[in-house]
Amino acid sequence: KELTSPMPGRVLKIMVKPGDKINIGDSLLSLEAMKMENILKSDGEGIVKEIYISEEQIVDKGEVLIEFQ
């Protein structure tokens, strides 16, 4: 399972790290788009397998941000 960017923007803060156990509703990262901060939250449970982005990185809509197992 993967978290993809719902919009183009800039990653402000990554709130998880590989190996973290996540639950539904956990905050994963914040993304700035059109001068607004958006918190992306988990829609499932699992463990963070890999993070493909870094803070301050510009991302495109649909880009894979985090992979879960």
Task: Say what each PLM segment does.
Residues K1-Q69:
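Structured functional modules or segments
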